[in-house]
């Protein structure tokens, strides 16, 4: 789960970068987009940039020529920092862009993607080309399928459009016995025993295939149980079935066949649910958060200030934030004392100048650094030992979380009464000032 959450954060960072790059514009063709796939050679690209520099020297327009040469030089300098292409490839954007107020500004972004990028690109244009980055945003969710009927069971996975059969086995179950008499009970008992053993074997193999032994967590985002008879239902309700996998069941579907044909049919019947899996996970996550609140367990926080206090204490296990939270984190310096303070403001608070003055001395608070709080969370959350989950406001639960709880909150590792914590910090301040 934590690994999945980390991937979602990386995807969010790439989305944010793409948005920024797509909106950037330059004069002439002074913006370079360069993508090197894994196992590409830095020397090849360095040579190509050298050739490009020679060609660009012949551009007639002096202004454009200087911009292009400057961008190529910048790319060459940045490449010198790499002796070889990183494991997942290398992405580099550099050039001179025009700000909203018409001023020119040099920018350079270079990074190793969080998963391999299978694209090779070099373009000099009046905009950055980000199309190739979209493949990084594609979901690599993997789903497990258990297709179980009276003849045997198949275990498979589906990731994107790739389906894989992990294992299948057949079973020979006795049919219902038609003869009466004493033996009927014995046959029924034997039949039930064989059924039970069949369900147990399937449950054990499911744990073997779908639980990662290193992390003791499921290695799939969700499970689909399929089959013709009622075995699939029996399995899903059986206490032999691993509870970690039980929590991952997305759907139980009826299929007309067993084996591979049943696997294909189960994929078709589950298409809609699989495409909504992020939505379902979000509903579950926020549902669990609301449960903590309704049961008043004391293991939850909401609102910017309380959430950040709990985060600093290391109390938050899961930090939940709306993906469009419009709050900035300010590092401010008191112009009189030189003391640094951190404050968090929304749009309305930013336009109120009193927020940038010390409430007691009225000294000006000078902005040292301003950063979207979302971005700060994405960069820093691992430091606090929590998982970070970005949610939308598209589900009913998500919408309620954004409207009612300010779009930020967390589930805690242990009980924490924020009111007593506030009172404590107030008395501490009072004692200090004595």
UniProtKB/Swiss-Prot annotation:
UniProt family annotation: Belongs to the eukaryotic release factor 1 family.
Principal cellular location given in the protein's record: cytoplasm
Record gene name: ERF1-2
Lineage: Eukaryota, Viridiplantae, Streptophyta, Embryophyta, Tracheophyta
Protein name: Eukaryotic peptide chain release factor subunit 1-2
One protein family per Pfam: eRF1_2
UniProt function note: Directs the termination of nascent peptide synthesis (translation) in response to the termination codons UAA, UAG and UGA. Modulates plant growth and development.
Cell compartments where the protein resides: Cytoplasm
Superkingdom per UniProt: Eukaryota
Example GO BP: translational termination
NCBIfam families referenced in this protein's UniProt entry, alphabetically: aRF1_eRF1
Alphabetically ordered keywords of this record: Acetylation, Cytoplasm, Growth regulation, Protein biosynthesis
Molecular function terms from GO: translation release factor activity
PTM-bearing positions, type N-acetylalanine: 2
Entry annotated with the keyword rRNA processing: no
GO cellular component: cytoplasm; extracellular region
Keyword Cytoplasm among UniProt keywords: yes
Subunit (UniProt): Heterodimer of two subunits, one of which binds GTP.
